[in-house]
């Protein structure tokens, strides 16, 4: 998505391969830039900032869904924001000037993480969520089904107005 107001280009990225992080990155880590929004200078490609919504992604939760630009009043101040609902089941609001995490709320039943920590902007994974750590996480299939049903039945262009209303009501 190109932001003419800020002259920034936002790119949603995919997941890594192989999906199993223990094979892809045996030493662990976030696998930076997987399942992220990366902001670049469109003139020369200079990296500006990124936000990773699924650190160490291992469930095919890519982040290349619609990136909606909006100006929202948050805590009495109008902020330039990104509205984004990737495959991990959370709806994100980010400051598009610098990638600062503002909020995230589940838009479908999420079984791999309990919530997104408001201080760090990182999902709080539930025990056993990573299939490479033990038995298969059967609920992840339920999660994917819920996300596909809730997220992909209509394009964001027709949904974002109701989502903005939800944000407005939550923020007062």
Regions found by a protein language model. Name each.
Residues 1-172:
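Beta-sheet-rich non-transmembrane sensory/scaffold domains
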